[in-house]
């Protein structure tokens, strides 16, 4: 199962070692799932951490060893994704769909919340706790 991580999930996983977002990284390290993020998502997470929790940049760098880097989406795909989410979030949705992720995991309820539990072009959008559930269901 491939889970695409939004910048806010990367941020939260970096600053909260016991949270749900970090649990996804641990499960990926154990081979229970694959995680992916785009340069756009990683850059946003790095900027936010540098401003708000600079001491957590090392944690993000360590976690990225378990996250596949996928390409940013073509601008045309981002334009298409803008039909579903705000323009600033369209590159995230577009990259997740372009990577053929099973799930886009995001904590952004304001912009993605109305899509939680729904699929957009084959990629289901879920908050971290719900994104974790199918991974745990696969673990023996």
Regions found by a protein language model. Give the residues of each.
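PIN/NYN-family metal-dependent endoribonuclease catalytic core
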Residues: 4-5, 17-51
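Short N-terminal binding/cap micro-motifs at the start of the first secondary-structure element
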Residues: 12-14
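Short secondary-structure boundary segments
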Residues: 39-40, 107-109
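Acidic catalytic patch
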Residues: 40, 61-83
């Amino acid at each position: 199962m491939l889970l695409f991580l939004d910048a806010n999930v990367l941020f939260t996983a970096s600053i909260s070692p016991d949270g749900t977002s970090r649990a996804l990284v641990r499960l990926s390290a154990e081979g229970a799932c694959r995680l992916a993020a785009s340069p756009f998502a990683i850059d946003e997470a790095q900027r936010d951490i540098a401003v708000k929790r600079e001491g957590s940049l090392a944690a993000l760098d360590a976690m990225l060893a378990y996250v596949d880097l996928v390409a940013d989406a073509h601008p045309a795909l981002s334009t298409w994704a803008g039909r579903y989410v705000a323009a600033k979030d369209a590159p995230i949705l577009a990259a997740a769909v372009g990577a053929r992720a099973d799930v886009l995991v995001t904590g952004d309820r304001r912009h993605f919340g109305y899509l939680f539990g729904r699929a957009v072009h084959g990629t289901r959008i879920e908050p971290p706790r719900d994104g974790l559930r199918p991974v745990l269901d696969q673990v023996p």
